[in-house]
């Protein structure tokens, strides 16, 4: 486990220091297209639909980012190589029917619809000559002579992975009384992963088929709003979602979905005839199996492909959010917010390489806050001009990497990072 290991620190390296090579590259191309269709049957019933296509290509060859590793000589780093060559195509479609009607004195706002998508990933795997490019010292780049040549990297396999997803849903917002509204809904989701195909490019393009898989689930959603006073509303909700995970595991298989339970409880206050709104929400979110970018590829090398992911275990987020909106003067808008989030691993497999139960996730600060103030001129030569400022605060957090059970490092991979504030004018 990670008990008793020394804390890590950030090396005293200037921001301007470049630890890559002069030949490395990362080329990405994105293409998107969409079409929408809207139709009104009458004042109460409307139909809308959307079709879209997305394509993403990435061609990457570089030394990898620095890892939390131990070297006897301070600052010494053996630079590993990474090669990524992927193409993703994503076809989606969605149709919704919105309607309003009454059953007796009870008012209903109905939403019913369906969505589907087809996802294809083509991944080239390479045989890179030498997993380690060379060794440098990040504290003093003059200690070693750096390589400048481009290593050989030959295509070995092409893996094509298709995924099909479909969902159908219905929800109804019911006004039981002028003070009480009830939201109830359910969604059925299906994910099919047909067998992927691996083409061995150096073996006469022979093809091997992987395993197919499918999963489906019903996901309920329920909520209630109670207007305690004209300007005070209380609300509570629960939702269960069948969250499909994009990307592939390190063996180019599709990831199973994650099940997420979310609970919310809050109050909405309106003061000063609508000039001031204050909302407070408490929440708990449980993800039964969080998908994150894989640390290593199937050969044990540091992973640079953000499309390769791993299921890391159950996480729990407990938090509270405060939102304030004010419009005291004509043209003046003030928005402020604060959030507290406590996110930890609450259940992990417990075997070697799994994350440590109870540890806070990296890059999840406990405290964040933001504020904006804008003024829009409505008279004279400056009519329509908007000026303002915004500030964002991110609290203390851990950078680096979460620790794993029986990890090779005898120190913590968590790096304490101080909070910061940015101001834009």
Predicted regions and their residues:
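Acidic/polar loop-and-plug regions of large Gram-negative outer-membrane beta-barrel proteins
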Residues: 1-40, 55-88, 132-156, 161, ...
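Residues that define the transmembrane beta-barrel architecture of outer-membrane proteins
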Residues: 27-31, 87-91, 162-166, 214-218, ...
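Surface-exposed extracellular loop regions of Gram-negative outer-membrane beta-barrel proteins
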Residues: 30-37, 44-100, 163-198, 217-243, ...
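Transmembrane beta-strands of outer-membrane beta-barrel pores
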Residues: 31, 53-59, 99-101, 114-120, ...
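Membrane-embedded beta-barrel scaffold of Gram-negative outer-membrane proteins
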Residues: 38-42, 46-52, 56-64, 233-234, ...
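Outer-membrane beta-barrel channels and translocator barrels
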Residues: 42-44, 98, 102-105, 177-181, ...
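Structural signature of Gram-negative outer-membrane beta-barrels, strongest in the C-terminal barrel
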Residues: 88, 107-111, 115-117, 159-287, ...
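Gram-negative outer-membrane beta-barrel transporters
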Residues: 310-402
